[in-house]
Amino acid sequence: MAKFRLSLVQFLVSPVKSDNLNKACKLIKEAAQKGAQIVALPECFNSPYGTKYFPEYAEKIPGESTELLSQVAKECGIYLIGGSIPEEDSGKFYNTCAVFGPDGTLLVKHRKIHLFDIDVPGKIRFQESETLSPGDSFSVFDTPYCKVGVGICYDMRFAELAQIYANKGCQLLVYPGAFNMTTGPAHWELLQRARALDNQVYVATASPARDEKASYVAWGHSTVVSPWGEVIAKAGFEETVISADIDLQYLAEIREQIPIRRQRRDNLYTVEEKKN
């Protein structure tokens, strides 16, 4: 299939987990009814984002939130990239994205590899590592349309991860993310366009909607970028669902016109996966 429809769900996350789950399911179904074949949710879609919230809202996988995602993926017959949730496993906490197939099967469980530890004086300090542990594996899944690579938010800053995914054959990279009011306007779109251009892939980001009253204010602006580096769909900061047609023939044409994959000097440099 040369084209398929991707939808990104952007909504306000509340402190009430059941409300978040109900809203997510409602918007997923709306996207599917409008033709979406792959749907992605935001980072931390079932809980407020913050180190104090992660242990309180954490679940095992499978658990309440992921069981519901499995059901709605099966009901809608879609591939569902389940944003992320705080996950608890053996006394450790992770920021984890669960991906489900059209039959409700868990395809991939991506634990955020690069933890969001930053300190911008006078603007923002955040240390995910105060409560979270990093993941240590790559997350790729197959669809009838193309191969998809998954990262979470801060993972997008690391060009090596995107290149490894592209080398594995991914044509679409999806990053549920929640950039803030400092890094969002400066880097959110720039990073997506860079990753798309570097690797000649489609890049999509799904953010929570902006809640000015939250302790952590998300930038919003869920986005889809083409392998030409062009923004082809972009949300504002409010609740919405955006969609884009992912055109794999267009991707193939770009790779043929500017054949950087054949022109890399592997005799001089390489980015490769370490075997655990």
Curated annotation (Swiss-Prot):
InterPro entries, sorted: C-N_Hydrolase, C-N_Hydrolase_sf, Nit1/2_C-N_Hydrolase
Record has Cytoplasm as a keyword: yes
Catalytic activity: 2-oxoglutaramate + H2O = 2-oxoglutarate + NH4(+); 2-oxosuccinamate + H2O = oxaloacetate + NH4(+)
GO MF annotation terms: 2-oxoglutaramate amidase activity; omega-amidase activity
E.C. code: 3.5.1.3
Record has Hydrolase as a keyword: yes
Keywords of this entry: Cytoplasm, Hydrolase
Pfam families associated with the record: CN_hydrolase
One GO CC term on file: mitochondrion
Active site per UniProt: E43 (proton acceptor), K112 (proton donor), C153 (nucleophile)
GO biological process assignments: asparagine metabolic process; glutamine metabolic process; oxaloacetate metabolic process
Top EC category: hydrolase
Subcellular location: Cytoplasm
Domain CN hydrolase: 4-248
Position of the signal peptide: none
PROSITE patterns membership: CN_HYDROLASE
Domain of life: Eukaryota
Quaternary structure note: Homodimer.
Family of the protein in this entry: Belongs to the carbon-nitrogen hydrolase superfamily. NIT1/NIT2 family.
Function: Has omega-amidase activity. The role of omega-amidase is to remove potentially toxic intermediates by converting 2-oxoglutaramate and 2-oxosuccinamate to biologically useful 2-oxoglutarate and oxaloacetate, respectively.
Protein name: Omega-amidase NIT2-B
Species for this entry: Xenopus laevis (African clawed frog)
Taxon lineage: Eukaryota, Metazoa, Chordata, Craniata, Vertebrata
